[in-house]
Amino acid sequence: MNFEIHNEEIDHKLEAYDYILDETLIANKPSKVRHESRLMIVRDSSLEEDFTTNKYTKNLLDELRKGDLVVVNDTKVMKARLKVELENGKLVELLVLEKADQSTWLCLARPAKKLKINSQLNLKSSLAKDIKLHISGTDKETGGRFIKFPENINDLISMNNLLDIYGETPLPPYIKSAEEESFHENSYQTEYASNPGAVAAPTAGLHLSKSLISNLKKKGILVMPITLHVGYGTFKPIDQEDLSNLKLHKEWVRVSSEVVEEIKRVKKTDRRVIAIGTTSVRALESCYSYEMGDLIPIDKYVDLVIKPGYKFKVVDGLLTNFHLPKSSLLLLVSAMIGRERLLNLYKKAIREKFRFFSYGDAMYISPDSFLVKK
């Protein structure tokens, strides 16, 4: 089968990105050692052995060359899940997404129908005094609520400080875990997380242990950070069947001039840019200015959509997890190696009992596996 031929009509249909997964393969906790998670390595589709399944994330070291640039997302997951009390005493859950204006923040709510506009909420903690919140409006795009916090909660730093006291780790709903909150505070965070702002983890980075990062550097592989605060744009379910005009919610990205200059140096040689996670891909590809025909540093919100037919300007390889059906992340990886091939690889991963989603195993998309060779 020739996986380099896109069927654009099929590729633009959401249903084409569906697959069946046994719930027992959804990982509810990570590997005991980060770099001991299983790794599927995807190679050139023309090879007889075009993928390998008997590897571990620590074997990524063998796939990379001296001089390669590995880019990680250093965002830090905030304890963005809040349990708040309604005026009638019943509890609802908020997920703080982003600042809307001054001290008003956009939050997803569960169940949302119980949050009436202009009503009050009570935020409690055994560690601090109660805080009164006010519901000021509804967001049409997300279905979330605009919540007015105290006036001093007006930036990421102040919000993160509040969440450290009142919040909980925002685990995805498909993770059914009996572990204590303290376990997830560590395990649902990368080793290099340093910039609070995410409401979900850049999960490919969960596979990188300190020792693996150290070994990469010892081999002469550069490891540099970018920041993309993982938010609604990454995990929002796609609600349209026709993907031709798909739009994603914006996410804040920072790529420094140092990273951009190193990428330019890499591109002048036979070295490669390897992204750790789809969020790193989205950040790096957002650096390309079509007006200037060049890479530029960025510090802004981006809403780049990567789906089949997209031509990669920056990224040569990718370490990623196994993603949910019909997700924007599945579209992104399909843009690299083709939708049909990716879904066939997922079938093989399912047969071999790979673990899926945030706490699951990993896939390495090697540079020679890209549909369009660099």
From Swiss-Prot:
Enzyme class: transferase
UniProt EC number: 2.4.99.17
Record flagged with keyword Cytoplasm: yes
Pathway terms, separated by semicolons: tRNA modification; tRNA-queuosine biosynthesis
Highest taxon of source: Bacteria
Reaction(s) this enzyme catalyzes, per UniProt: 7-aminomethyl-7-carbaguanosine(34) in tRNA + S-adenosyl-L-methionine = epoxyqueuosine(34) in tRNA + adenine + L-methionine + 2 H(+)
GO cellular component, one term: cytoplasm
Xref: Pfam families: Queuosine_synth
Intracellular or extracellular location(s): Cytoplasm
Keywords of the record: Cytoplasm, Queuosine biosynthesis, S-adenosyl-L-methionine, Transferase
Keyword Transferase: yes
GO molecular function: S-adenosylmethionine:tRNA ribosyltransferase-isomerase activity
SUPFAM superfamilies: QueA-like
Function: Synthesizes oQ from preQ1 in a single S-adenosylmethionine-requiring step. The ribosyl moiety of AdoMet is transferred and isomerized to the epoxycyclopentane residue of oQ.
Family as reported in the entry's similarity comment: Belongs to the QueA family.
UniProt cross-references to PANTHER family, sorted A to Z: S-ADENOSYLMETHIONINE:TRNA RIBOSYLTRANSFERASE-ISOMERASE
Protein name: S-adenosylmethionine:tRNA ribosyltransferase-isomerase
Organism annotation: Prochlorococcus marinus subsp. pastoris (strain CCMP1986 / NIES-2087 / MED4)
